[in-house]
Design a protein with these regions (language model features):
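Single conserved hydrophobic/aromatic residue that forms the stacking wall/gate
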Residues: 153-161
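ATP/Mg2+-dependent ligation/transfer catalytic cores
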Residues: 1-152
Length: 161
């Protein structure tokens, strides 16, 4: 049996005003994900003449689908300083002051044109009809939200799905 493990490294790119998620998979015999690098010029995080950026693992989760582990990363510059696109570092500094807050993930699925899926006029109806709804008139893209539920099977349970 092989001792090779796969780690899917996940990070936010440098696109503005809204960054996108990026990922790449590393196969290794190491028991925990090592630091890794990537070409920041392809993700709006570095100039082409000096494009190395570092991926520093923050948290690792068991992956219920493809690779062995999902590795949430923060980005640092090649000199190991916090990268400007790394908003996690600022949030971590703020949280060190013992603030309490929670996150609830609520989302709408949209088409490429930005309009919500499932509403003929492009605008959602009043919330009462589809809040916690079922059926084709009230729910679109259920397979995506069900895939989201796979988070329950990672090493840390999801909360408030």
């Amino acid at each position: 049996m092989s001792d090779i493990k796969t780690y899917e490294y996940i990070w936010l790119d440098g696109y503005q005003p809204e960054p996108s998620m990026r990922s790449k998979i590393k196969a290794t015999d190491e028991d925990s994900p090592p630091d890794w690098s990537f070409d920041g010029s392809s993700t709006q995080q570095a100039e082409g003449n000096s494009s190395d950026c570092l991926l520093l693992p923050v948290q690792t989760y068991d992956n219920p689908t493809f690779s062995d582990h999902l590795v949430m990363c923060q980005v640092h510059a090649a000199d190991h300083t916090v990268h400007p696109s790394n908003t996690r570092a600022a949030a971590e500094a703020l949280l060190s002051d013992e603030w309490w807050f929670g996150f609830e993930q609520e989302y709408f699925l949209t088409g490429k044109d930005g309009s919500p899926l499932g509403w003929e006029d492009g605008q959602p109806r009043p919330q009462g009809d589809y809040y916690c709804g079922v059926g084709a008139d009230n729910v679109q893209g259920r397979e995506i939200s069900e895939a989201h539920l796979c988070l329950l099977y990672t090493s840390d349970a999801a909360d408030d799905l």
